[in-house]
């Protein structure tokens, strides 16, 4: 129904045109003409022109973003060329998500090694809710644009955030609610799953401004040249917040006015002398050498006699009080490691002296030794957490200490504990020093930790097979495997390792044969000795062309084997007799 005013107007127009009551068709045509916008006359032209769509359906072109504008956030990329994916992700974060202060680092150029190499992008979000929304949108962009399934760490989803807010608001303690939620969603880490040809990934950190300043992730991923730019500056305490004594004095204004109008023609400070300048310079040098007390403490401990009774906990507390938590060098870590070892050796010798003297009270000495041992293990975690670089010497020294602990108590349960500690210790080097797993010293000490005079680990044979399959067995490692298998009386594994798993070069080595025979004679039985001769295992010397006469140790061990087995080497098989006596087959 049309309104009365409009309908009366249309009726008057129709009467003027026709002079009679209008029909329905004529009324509809007049109403269409009256209320149309005047563009239906040229229907062909209007359908082809872009203005035929209403203004609210016409698409407006997206304006180009002026990156030179000071109001547009800058993106800081590494000096080296970066993949297009990094550029696209950073631009999307800036243009679509509103992330500011975007910085990208290439971890291959970082001053410290990283667990996962690639490109790390840092960006600031305005709030925790902005960070949650940006995380969701960025993961959706990566999924639709590149077809990957990114992963995120940190924070909670928006739905979970709302649930927790409602749950905490029902408790009525809004202060604790806001504090709890703020710590869970102010930092997001997104693994984009985008990799280049070298296997380098892209990792995005979305942080609030306060969280970013607190973590200072730039100091971890920057290069050595940029390290000074991102180093945290320790602000000196200011006295501006302290109250002024004159604030409560009603005559303070008159006093300041009098001081402004007065002139002083004298100085209350003493004149500078040569002694004063010398003392000032000495004070400045002492400030620069602020680590001197730390090294003096370690030197004083090293100069103490071996029989001195020490309290390890007190010494370590003194060390922590003088420890510098910034600008740490390898010299600082060497001092800490030396102090830990000195304390351990002191307590170890004290325990040994007490055991030799048949002392009844050994509990406090064992507690001190256990404390020093655990402190040495915690050293590796502490150094890695404070961006220190672990080295081979520290690992070898720690393995020697673990061998000493094994000698004190070498039961099966203790071997299992040492093996578990060894796994945790090697995990620190898994990503930073993987070549150490091929090192001869590390491998030999690892083998020693698997067996004792009282027990052996079930994993010993598997570890020996692992060394065989990976090709880590050189002469020294093969000799140590033979000695340990013989000590554990694993005769079947020993024969398999010697005659089937050992390479031809090692089987032709006279020193390997000499240690093999000596280990058999030291830990074997007459039945085993006879079986080596009867089953023809000794004939491998002839097959491999080993010169028995050239190695006196091998020759004497072979003669002793025949003698202890009840055989006469001179009356043995002619082939073997000539080989033993002359060093060659006739």
Curated annotation (Swiss-Prot):
Q: Where is the transit peptide?
A: 1-35
Q: Which UniProt keywords apply?
A: Membrane, Mitochondrion, Mitochondrion inner membrane, Transit peptide
Annotated region described as Disordered, given as residue ranges: 39-59
- Location relative to the cell: Mitochondrion inner membrane
Annotated InterPro entries: Atp25, ATP25_mRNA_stabil_dom, NT_sf
Recorded GO CC terms? mitochondrial inner membrane; mitochondrion
- Please name the SUPFAM superfamilies in this protein's record: Nucleotidyltransferase
> Example GO biological process term?
mitochondrial gene expression
Membrane topology term reads: Peripheral membrane protein
This protein is called ATPase synthesis protein 25, mitochondrial
